[in-house]
A protein has these predicted regions:
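Non-catalytic, conserved peripheral segments adjacent to functional cores
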Residues: 1-97, 121, 130
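Short hydrophobic/aromatic-rich beta-strand segments that constitute the beta-sheet cores
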Residues: 80-81, 107, 115, 128
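Conserved metal-binding segment of the jelly-roll/cupin
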Residues: 99-113
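A short beta-strand-loop micro-motif that forms or neighbors metal/cofactor-
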Residues: 112-130
Length: 130
C-alpha cells in the first residue's frame, strides 16, 4: 500500500469540476504538496530520466526532509518506485517496490526514503514538484 509513503497522483475516483464553459475539467485534491521549512516554497521543474538497465541494484536512497516530492509523467508510461519509511537512515529491510502504472504519478511525503526515478522505457519526462 503506497499511502504510507505518499500519494498516487491520478484522476481515478475524483469527480471533476467542469470549467471554461465546459471545455475543460479540473481535478482537485490529487496530492498534498508540502514545504515544511519556514518560508519554504514548492517549485515545478521538468525532469528527464533515461531507461535503467535491468537487473539493477538498489544500493542507495535519498530523502527530502523539508518537503514532499512529486513526479508526474508528461506522457503515459510506467516507472518503478522503491521507497522506505522515514528515519535517520533507510532501513533496507523495509524497502518496498511499486510499479507505477500508465497515467499515474507519485507524491512522496516529506522524509520518505526513495531511490531516484527509475524509467522503464527509453525516456521518462515528468513534471517534478519539490
Amino acid at each position: 500500500n503506497f499511502k504510507k509513503f505518499g500519494d498516487m497522483i491520478t484522476t481515478d475516483d475524483i469527480k471533476p469540476l467542469e470549467i471554461n464553459d465546459g471545455y475543460a475539467k479540473r481535478y482537485d485534491g490529487i496530492a498534498n504538496l508540502d514545504a515544511k521549512k519556514d518560508g519554504g516554497e514548492s517549485i515545478i521543474s521538468i525532469f528527464s530520466a533515461l531507461k535503467r538497465l535491468f537487473p539493477m541494484k538498489v544500493d542507495m536512497m535519498e530523502k527530502h526532509p523539508l518537503g514532499s516530492q512529486a513526479f508526474i509523467p508528461m506522457k503515459e508510461t510506467t516507472f518503478l518506485a522503491f521507497v522506505a519509511p522515514e528515519g535517520d537512515k533507510p532501513d533496507l529491510n523495509k524497502v518496498e517496490a511499486f510499479i507505477i502504472p500508465n497515467g499515474i504519478g507519485v507524491n512522496y511525503n516529506a522524509g520518505i526514503w526513495h531511490f531516484p526515478l527509475i524509467a522503464t522505457h527509453a525516456l521518462l519526462k515528468s513534471l517534478l514538484s519539490l
